[in-house]
């Protein structure tokens, strides 16, 4: 085999998987789709297996108020929360007690605790990411509902990677925090390209960003 032939084989060997990934992205990346599919008013949650990520504090409060307004009778629920966030866990458990149903709970280790140095947080961040990756691979929800905390970003991208690899078909629904009136949060900006549905609560945001949905204030 001469040098030119060997070079052609090498280029083809490298380029083929890259091309396959790019084609796959064209099919699954929501930001590359035309927004016609979100012009019609749709139910936020339909009958499915739903995962709900609780981000602690105000994010958990907003999420619980949103959930309380949805018809969840035919929805199988799994709650994802940060390890040690007992307040969020208690709110989810209280909701399930009032609903008279049972559900699953998945704790995700914190990537970084308050006051922890950035250097010492490297191993804990890696551990949190790997734990989340394994947990999501086992769980593979039909729909995951997120609303803004930084914790949701790695979880969403892990699920998107699994979609890219054909391991799941999770629909990612992101609801921007009510506090965001004129500009999306950093989490929102990061998740806008990969979210199947992206919902804002202020018309000013709806006018600024393509692909977003607006149904008024949800909480």
Swiss-Prot record:
Gene3D superfamilies: Glycogen Phosphorylase B (3.40.50.2000). Residues 30-219 are cytoplasmic. One of its GO terms (biological process) is dolichol-linked oligosaccharide biosynthetic process. InterPro entries: Oligosacch_biosynth_Alg14. It is a single-pass membrane protein. GO terms for molecular function: N-acetylglucosaminyldiphosphodolichol N-acetylglucosaminyltransferase activity; protein-membrane adaptor activity. It is found in: Endoplasmic reticulum membrane; Nucleus membrane. GO terms for cellular component: cytoplasmic side of Golgi membrane; lipid droplet; nuclear membrane; UDP-N-acetylglucosamine transferase complex. It comes from the Eukaryota. Keywords: Endoplasmic reticulum, Membrane, Nucleus, Transmembrane, Transmembrane helix. The keyword NAD does not apply. The chain crosses the membrane at residues 9-29. Residues 1-8 are lumenal. Heterodimer with ALG13 to form a functional enzyme. Involved in protein N-glycosylation. Essential for the second step of the dolichol-linked oligosaccharide pathway. Anchors the catalytic subunit ALG13 to the ER. Belongs to the ALG14 family. This is UDP-N-acetylglucosamine transferase subunit ALG14. It comes from Candida albicans (strain SC5314 / ATCC MYA-2876) (Yeast).
């Amino acid at each position: 085999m001469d040098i030119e032939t060997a070079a052609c084989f090498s280029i083809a060997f490298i380029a083929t998987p890259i091309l396959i990934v790019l084609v796959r992205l064209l099919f699954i990346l929501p930001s590359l789709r035309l927004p016609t599919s979100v012009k019609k008013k749709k139910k936020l949650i339909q009958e499915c297996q739903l995962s709900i990520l609780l981000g602690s504090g105000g994010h958990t409060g907003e999420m619980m108020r949103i959930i309380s307004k949805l018809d969840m009778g035919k929805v199988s629920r799994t709650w994802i929360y940060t390890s040690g966030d007992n307040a969020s866990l208690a709110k989810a458990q209280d909701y399930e007690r009032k609903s008279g149903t049972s559900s699953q709970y998945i704790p995700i280790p914190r990537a970084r605790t308050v006051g922890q140095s950035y250097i010492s947080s490297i191993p804990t961040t890696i551990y949190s990411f790997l734990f989340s990756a394994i947990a999501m691979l086992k769980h593979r929800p039909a729909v995951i509902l997120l609303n803004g905390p930084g914790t949701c970003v790695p979880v969403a991208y892990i699920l998107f990677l699994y979609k890219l690899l054909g391991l799941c078909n999770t629909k990612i629904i992101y609801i921007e925090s009510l506090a965001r009136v004129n500009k999306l949060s950093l989490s929102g900006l990061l998740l806008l390209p990969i979210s199947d549905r992206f919902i804002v609560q202020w018309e000013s945001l709806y006018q600024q960003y393509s692909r977003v949905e607006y149904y008024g204030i949800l909480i």
